[in-house]
Amino acid sequence: PKPFLLHGVTASGKTEVYMRVIEAVLARGESAIVLVPEISLTPQMTRSFCQRFGRNVAVLHSKLSSGERFDEWRRAERGDAKIVVGARSAVFAPVRNLGFIVVDEEHENSYKQEESPRYHARDVACERARISNAVCVLGSATPSVESYHRALRGEYNLLELPHRVEMWEMPTVEVVDMREELAEGNRSMFSRALSQAISDSLDRGEQVILFLNRRGYSTFVLCRECGYSMRCPECDVALTYHAAGSSIRCHYCDHEEPVPLVCPSCGSRYIRYFGAGTQKIEGEVKRVFPRARTVRMDTDTTRRKGAHETIVGKFKKGEYDILVGTQMVAKGLDFPNVTLVGVISADTCLNLPDYKAGERTFQLLTQVAGRAGRGEKGGHVVVQTYSPEHYAIELGETYDYKGFFDEEISCRNEGMYPPFSRLILVVVSGKNLRVVEKYSTALVRTLQAKVRSVKEWKSIRILGPAPCALARVRGMHRWQILLKVDPCITPHDHNKLIEEMLEACPPPSYDIIIQVDIDPESML
């Protein structure tokens, strides 16, 4: 059977749909796999499934110890557990007699494994279901543009849940133009509307989620005297200030150093912190709302095993009033007493050099807004932005997915981006910048010659070579070549083109690393 795309608004009961199908699958003596995009969502999904199906549920994800993972793997393999819940690697679970696969929040880019072997769990799920003659359901409130396009073309069966359960209203959304706030003298990171809404929610004994997709305290550290920016010695990125431990840290290679007392360039003491991360938001909340019990959930606070469950559990029990977090808090979590969500900066994703920036912004706004009003009390969302006129924000304000899809698909068609092409990203990296640049240029010449020589390949567009958006990571200089390939060209031809390119133009030394990513999720 063709895969099903279940497009249901947040809190529309998609999990209940999955469970009812699984009940029917188990009654036929078959097994099921349920994929979730984040490890932080696994405990909540597991709890729901265990309450319904008891010991029939196994859990698989990377935070388990090897012994725990082995035990769960064996339970699935022996048939002791008929349902496997887990993150992307659970798609390979050795269940017996597979009848059903769910890919929940199918739009999430965390389903793509960026290390070798590269794969997208959604594609693996669809293929495994086809081979096993099983049913595959892709669920999302904000389906990926590619998946929705496939559904409209009839490659997927489209199912829709347009209303919340018990006809609860979607949260109201208020977009605040931060340019106007600044013009009227408000230099705080909280708009007046958000400050008032937080105060009102706390007075009513309700909970608040504040979302900012950037961890740390400040995004960069700068000398006001000479303009010197503290940068990672190994990567081409600014170091992020972390108040805990008073250090500056690289989020790509984990390089860490103490905050300098004077500028390393000019010796000035005018060192200042710019930008805001979740740590800074947490500190500001504690300053402005000192009586509120505040907790932060990001990569820094959830490094320890079980930290996700602890924070989520305590917040759900009402031990905290305000949850400050990154995208971890945007997905799938269910807190009935949360009536207010504040998006501190909707522009964080929007300004990334990535063709999916608009899509990611719309998805994050819709998903994080969906954490509010998941009960009888109703919900309100305050979105702070410097780009209120952008279609991703305008249409996110009204949850208009179809309107957003029409805008986005038009932009993709114009730029020949997926689904109107398949992308192949070739990244060349090495210690010596001149060698990397020279070899990247030689690769492009080789590709151009190959494309001209084969009739079926003449439609392929080659962009580059150019430095990657992150031009240096862990001491390695990085250049990229992007191929836009007609979707009609087969994966076999993709591989043939890459193989012939590397045969005709082998790397000049072992110091050069070549990474080939077909259908990259990010251009960063």
Predicted segment positions?
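Inter-lobe coupling/hinge segments of SF2-like helicase ATPases
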Residues: 2-437, 441, 469-471, 480-481, ...
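Short amphipathic alpha-helices in soluble, non-transmembrane regions
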Residues: 439-445, 493-502
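A subset of signal/propeptide-processing and intrinsically disordered low-complexity segments
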Residues: 490, 495, 512-514
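Hydrophobic, Leu/Ile/Phe/Ala-enriched alpha-helical segments that form helix-helix packing faces
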Residues: 285, 368-372, 447-451, 501-506
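Nucleotide-binding motor/catalytic cores of P-loop/tubulin-like NTPases across gene-expression machines
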Residues: 454-455, 474-477, 489
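Short helix-terminating capping/connector loops at secondary-structure junctions
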Residues: 204, 376-377, 455-459, 508-511
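A carboxyl-terminal module marker
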Residues: 445, 449, 455-473, 498-499, ...
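Short helix-capping segments at alpha-helix termini
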Residues: 53, 289, 450-456, 506-509
